[in-house]
Amino acid sequence: MIRMKISARNQLRGTVETIVLGVVTAKVSVRVGDNLIESVITRQSVEDLNIKIGSEVTAVIKSTEIMLMVD
């Protein structure tokens, strides 16, 4: 497996708590400690990354967006 390196420094590890699927997008809620972070990503990304409730993900926070990545 290839390990990704990215320039974003704000990365928070968490667990997917809820996924609300729309036609094109999905709202993914990630529990990070006592906090809940929500990210709107494409439905296709949820499927491609195999994100499910209980999945461990990393929230990558940029000034304009929150991306999700999986190992």
State each model region's role:
Residues M1-D71:
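Non-catalytic connector elements of ABC transporters
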